[in-house]
A protein has these predicted regions:
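Conserved catalytic or regulatory cores that recognize and/or transform ribose-phosphate-containing ligands
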Residues: 1-122
């Protein structure tokens, strides 16, 4: 399965803290998990066409991430929004997806991502 993990490029500390744990997770070995920061000159719009799922780290407001979420919606991808406890997320997201997860620890986030992927397998 191909999974795109979208996140803010600026002030991306919530996902940066979890990044290495997700990369070391068994899920990353079983599926193609892509973070935009791993790629140079990356065309996320084109890449999303070939994805099975989008996980959006929405703790930090980001116009670019909002655009990517819009593309994922246009392509009919399931979208799962995750955010750090205490973050104020955009109300507009509820019109895009009903899948939200608030996490306190990196371990909670990785466990949630593993659960989502295991339950959505193609």
């Amino acid at each position: 399965m191909r999974i795109y993990v979208g996140h803010a490029r600026v002030n991306a500390s919530p996902i940066n803290e979890s990044y290495e744990m997700i990369k070391k997770s068994p899920v990353n070995g079983l599926h193609e998990v892509v973070f935009p920061r791993d790629r140079n000159n990356f065309d996320s719009k084109e890449f999303l066409k070939s994805c099975d799922l989008m996980i959006a780290e929405v703790s930090v407001p980001s116009t670019g991430l909002g655009i990517e979420i819009g593309w994922a919606t246009m392509y009919g991808l399931p979208i799962f929004c995750v955010y750090k406890k205490g973050s104020k997320i955009s109300n507009s997201l509820k019109y895009i997806t009903g899948n939200f997860f608030e996490y306190s620890t990196n371990e909670e986030l990785v466990a949630y991502i593993e659960n989502v992927i295991n339950n959505i397998k193609k």
